[in-house]
Amino acid sequence: MSGIHDFTLASARDALKARKISAVELTNAHIDAIERLDGQLNSFITRTPDQAREAAKASDEALAKGEGGSLCGIPLGIKDLFCTNGVRTTAASKILGNFVPPYESTVTANLLKDGAVFLGKLNLDEFAMGSANLTSAFGPVENPWKRKDSDAKLVPGGSSGGSAAAVAAGLVLGATGTDTGGSIRQPAAFTGIAGIKPTYGRCSRFGTIAFASSLDQAGPMARNLQDCAILLESMAGFDPRDSTSVDTPVPHYEAALKRGVKGLRVGIPKEYHVEGMPAEIEALWQQGMTWLRDVGAEIVEVSLPHTKYGLPTYYIAALAEASSNLARYDGVRFGERVSASTLDGLYEASRAAGFGDEVKRRILIGTHVLSSGYYDAYYLRAQKVRTLIQQDFLKAFENVDVLLTPTAPSGAFAQDEKPTDPVQMYLNDVFTVPASMAGVPALSVPAGLDARGVPLGLQLIGKFFDEETLIAAGHAIEQAAAFHHRPTIHAGVSA
């Protein structure tokens, strides 16, 4: 079965429909890989092999009748921020403990309706707050990649680090992620895979545990953009249970791969040439411009003048929303519960014990910026600047079709290289946050390796609800980059 782990999601779909492989075979191979490798990677919080085998058996029965949806028999992993009916959902936090939702998130329900097989729930930064998957109550996730000159354990990025690591290592054919300020794109870049943050409102947030409600957006993570396109078409769609869901048709995203980019105007934001950017990141960015120019795109410099305010604005607006969203967790019904002599004391002690340090830091900051006397100075001002950031993008898109930037300011760093200053960690999102603040779609594609053999990604940012053009441009980069490298730890590599 060694060849099974060479499948992409698209090629596995085609093989299943042609009956060249059974869903049970495919699922068992991935379950075996998880059992073999995830003790080291720690990409899963909860595994569901028995349910997966039952679902695979049902998929084979459907396929034998010529039935089944677009994902029939495809083994996926689900970020443990999506509520899954009857399966533990933790948000990687002790405060949720062994919470088992009695309902299904819309995104996962859509995937199940199309026949997907869920292998389990994937690790993440606690409540999706982090850029390195180091804040999980269930331990850090290890990036399956290694540097050429070191055996140090690398971070997979965050917050969707478990999703990224599982896809990169071949433990799943695709995974769900969420992106609030870069949590799909940055880990995709760190692990050499593709990831799409759709337009805000494209995928329903119903049943997804909230971090920052005006920013959170679900999206796909997979080996390449074709696989991401297949997943996104299933995940997306209007949902009346989410007041921010937008009622607009979902295109056939996979068809966008054939569109080509001749005549496409690609904007290069001059403000993204940040001080101290490593030479190899700058060189990769220039290479990306060359690749697109070579297939007929036009490169145009643009200005996003409020870029420098992106991070501080994000860390005011997002943390304010987080402090409000996380106020509901009290330790009474589930999760970490600490006894106290009064009800208020129980709340305080349970929250102090149940939340990790990074989450508590963000709750404190968010509560402060919303407090009397500081609301106008911080939160209200941040919302006004956020509008200016969005206007920057709208103005740029009057002249160009997409924007091209690096995804992250570096490749993956070692787990023990974590900066002690949280602000330094927040800088990992410097290139991804502005698109989140504007609500526009963005994606990351693997484009090369750094000098130490670790993946680097390029980011494309698009117009509202124009994920198709992003996918077409991203596919052009994929074809030119020909990124076929495999990480050190991979299901297809013999132990």
From Swiss-Prot:
Which reactions fall under this protein's catalytic activity? L-glutamyl-tRNA(Gln) + L-glutamine + ATP + H2O = L-glutaminyl-tRNA(Gln) + L-glutamate + ADP + phosphate + H(+)
Q: Name one GO molecular function term.
A: ATP binding
Q: Which GO terms describe its cellular component?
A: glutamyl-tRNA(Gln) amidotransferase complex
What keywords were assigned to this record? ATP-binding, Ligase, Nucleotide-binding, Protein biosynthesis
Q: Which Pfam families match?
A: Amidase
Question: What's the family?
Answer: Belongs to the amidase family. GatA subfamily.
Q: What is this protein called?
A: Glutamyl-tRNA(Gln) amidotransferase subunit A
- From which organism does this entry originate? Gluconobacter oxydans (strain 621H) (Gluconobacter suboxydans)
Q: What is the lineage of its organism?
A: Bacteria, Pseudomonadati, Pseudomonadota, Alphaproteobacteria, Acetobacterales
**Gene designation per UniProt:** gatA
